Amino acid sequence: MDGKLRADEVAVTKSILKSTFNMWMDVIDVDVVIVGAGPSGLTAAKYLAQKGVKTVVLERHLSFGGGTWGGGMGFPNIVVEKPADEILREAGIKLDEVDGEDELFTADSVEVPAKLGVAAIDAGAKILTGIVVEDLILKEDKIAGVVIQSYAIEKAGLHIDPLTISAKYVIDSTGHDASAVHTLARKNKDLGIEVPGEKSMWAEKGENSLTRNTREIFPGLYVCGMAANAYHAGYRMGAIFGGMYLSGKKCAEMILEKMEK
């Protein structure tokens, strides 16, 4: 390649500002906001966007995937069981059978979030990183969107007013913290919402309770993944992720069913 590269500083800045403005104008009014881009959130985003639902995923960190990247104690593998393996296969993720375990598979802890994130994006979901949801929009006893702030501004402790995104439905997929539900409970004590938090580890119990605990816990607000178990005092599971993928898929299906009515 012999051609000279064009790199005008002002043109770069203008390009970023124009694209960013157009992007924000497109996402300030959506069908679904997903808070947290972990395994359940990305899965929900994929299945919602595939059906043409306008979906935006907000993640406070600069990367998506939640705790998947670290595998188990830093070892670069996670475990997934049947039938959740089909969700990963749909995203083109390679799975290895576990000797002596007919129902279990291992997957690369870097490949999984990378390909699942791409699958959500390719389906039409928008993932925004570095954005924290600091509050919810509550109108007439229904969640109507989220209040957002730059995570960098929050970390710096600066007093700067936030912006908002309007949504028909909000999903809390923030993991163990269940931060969106905690915020709703803390700021609106008259609603009587309590978040007991998750119990200690019991992998089988925790996995099987995830889909059961995935539900609409307040008009317009759903919980999935570990946020669902935190809200319902379910057990934690460790580095087995099948329940979280199934929870995200179920959450998407519940919202799709409601939107069809």
UniProtKB/Swiss-Prot annotation:
Cofactor list: Fe(2+)
Chain positions recorded as glycine binding sites: 236
Gene3D superfamilies referenced in this protein's UniProt entry, alphabetically: FAD/NAD(P)-binding domain
Gene Ontology molecular function: any one: pentosyltransferase activity
Iron in keyword set: yes
EC number in record: 2.4.2.59
Pathway recorded for this protein: Cofactor biosynthesis; thiamine diphosphate biosynthesis
Binding site for NAD(+): 40, 59-60, 67, 133, 159-161, 179, 226
Pfam families named among the record's database cross-references: Thi4 (PF01946)
Keywords: Iron, Metal-binding, NAD, Thiamine biosynthesis, Transferase
Catalysed reactions, semicolon-separated: hydrogen sulfide + glycine + NAD(+) = ADP-5-ethyl-4-methylthiazole-2-carboxylate + nicotinamide + 3 H2O + H(+)
Keyword rRNA-binding: no
InterPro entries: FAD/NAD-bd_sf, Thi4_fam, Thi4_prok
Binding site for Fe cation: 161, 176
Listed GO biological process terms: thiamine biosynthetic process; thiamine diphosphate biosynthetic process; thiazole biosynthetic process
Purpose: Involved in the biosynthesis of the thiazole moiety of thiamine. Catalyzes the conversion of NAD and glycine to adenosine diphosphate 5-(2-hydroxyethyl)-4-methylthiazole-2-carboxylate (ADT), an adenylated thiazole intermediate, using free sulfide as a source of sulfur.
Record's subunit section: Homooctamer; tetramer of dimers.
Protein family (similarity comment): Belongs to the THI4 family.
Annotated protein name in UniProt: Thiamine thiazole synthase
